[in-house]
């Protein structure tokens, strides 16, 4: 006689089988234990040392993945045999978790709360609509028997089975057996979440495009105002250019400094007539004018005598 533990539906059933294999008697029905995925997820979220990456929500009825890259790289390999965040989200969807906020990864389930680990057994996998259709025979028996003690769950890991569906079941460590239909059961929720994120991005893109169009219009209005209301600077006229040339023909800077430095003859220099910077009257001219004046006076006196 041997005690056999098998998983049927959502319960652990302990069976007692005789050596001849003719009759099997059910000894007891054990309360269903939570799925390994749920237990590990609860342990991962409840760890206070990783609150900067994943933590409980404000009401402690949700949990938030604050930094998905670090969550997938550093935390997932410690609890699961993969580091794929998308696969983790798909598994949450298969157990009825929903994404409640569009702009962050916050998930909720009515039986997944802080301090209520006993409620995890109330969370079950979703039944896919394709389960009613006939399925091909699995690559390994659906019910695996383990000769263990009466209430001990299996503790030693199994070797990876062969086959696509079996490999998926071993990869995520959800149950002892799985099928491709169950694995893809939560794809609709993930698609809805991604569609909502896509709509948010499109809305933000439209807002940025409208702001860009407004800035372009403002820029064009400023250019139009400057062209129609601001007069351009006129070029210098020809007279100004000519005066500049006459200034260049004037006395040199050295002569000006010498004339300014001379203490006497300032008034004479100012009254003197110049041509191209050269004085037309000098000392010889003064003497000549004095001689002419004296001759004129002599002529006047002779005429009077």
Curated annotation (Swiss-Prot):
Signal peptide positions (record): none
GO biological process: regulation of transcription by RNA polymerase II
Nuclear localization signal (motif): residue ranges: 286-289
Pfam families per the UniProt record, alphabetical: HSF_DNA-bind
Superkingdom in the source lineage: Eukaryota
MF (Gene Ontology): DNA-binding transcription factor activity; sequence-specific DNA binding
Region (Disordered): 286-305
InterPro entries documented for this protein: HSF_DNA-bd, WH-like_DNA-bd_sf, WH_DNA-bd_sf
Renumbered residue ranges of the record's region Hydrophobic repeat HR-A/B: 201-230
Name of the protein in question: Heat stress transcription factor B-4d
Originating organism: Oryza sativa subsp. japonica (Rice)
